[in-house]
């Protein structure tokens, strides 16, 4: 899972986290089980280069070994914050926590792809098994900073969910679409949506 640790990160004195949160960003982490011994600092540097392909500016890390946390941001974490992170991310001895701080779309894309990359690298996936997934409650829009505006995430003809109509004027990034997709092994098999059929909404 991509664990949202924004609330915890906001309590630190780490300027990168603070500035990102003030600008509407989030901080999420993935727990690589047993990863502390699998990835040296050089290995983590390679993972950092990987997430940069998805517009992430960097990758923070914490290793949990012998009941102690160590890593690139440990000096910004007092004992209480360390305990919160361990609890909220379900860290166990030997685990590695990888953290990205950025805008939500960048965080989700970079960490999601990093998770898949590590799974393949460590032979954690089984190509003989098929896991089907229905994707629902997909966001209507994504804000792209390089263009300075919102873009449709499904297609521009999809209608907004009833409870989110007012968000189109106030916070379009939080509005959800009436659409669905069927995915297997990360590949989309098919999907559909309710089209915009009200003149006033169009």
Predicted regions, residues:
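Class II aminoacyl-tRNA synthetase catalytic cores and aaRS-like
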Residues: 1-202
